[in-house]
């Protein structure tokens, strides 16, 4: 899926294949992207995958925390609103894997700043939203 939707300025939601293993800049530069559901099969996500996206939330379904390409930046770094202020977004992970994400070297920073949440919290935070798998 390398570069599949890269730079798509109108994409707000996308359904990714359930067999996807590697997200390699598939959504980089998709600035209108508001939400994403990352399938259970994903093992790697590109650095800055969601840079400049208008992300409200991401649902990350893999039980094992995915690794990041190019470890300097994380996929969810540099998410800004239209005034270039850091956007407040949440990353929801499976409840039974939350502790593993929270202690993971790559994901723990999101937990420290309150961006990482259990998937069961999604319905409370977004009562009018439904996510697709």
Could you describe each region identified by the protein language model?
Residues 7-21, 31-44, 53-67, 84-97, ...:
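Structural signature of tandem-repeat unit edges
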Residues 72-82:
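BRCT (BRCA1 C-terminal) domain core and associated BRCT-interaction motifs
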Residues 28, 51, 73, 99-116, ...:
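Surface-exposed repetitive/solenoidal architectures
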Residues 24, 46, 101:
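Short acidic, gly/pro-rich beta-turn/loop elements at beta-sheet edges
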């Amino acid at each position: 899926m390398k570069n599949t939707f890269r730079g798509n300025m109108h994409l707000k939601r996308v359904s990714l294949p359930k067999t996807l293993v590697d997200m390699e800049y598939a959504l980089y530069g998709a600035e209108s992207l508001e939400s994403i559901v990352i399938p259970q099969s994903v093992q790697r996500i590109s650095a800055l995958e969601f840079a400049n996206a208008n992300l409200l939330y991401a649902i990350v379904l893999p039980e094992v925390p995915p690794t990041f390409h190019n470890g300097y930046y994380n996929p969810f770094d540099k998410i800004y609103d239209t005034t270039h202020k850091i956007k407040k977004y949440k990353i929801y992970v499976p409840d039974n894997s939350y502790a593993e994400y929270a202690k993971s070297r790559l994901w723990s920073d999101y937990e420290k700043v309150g961006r990482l949440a259990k998937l069961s919290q999604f319905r409370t935070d977004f009562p009018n939203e439904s996510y697709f798998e």
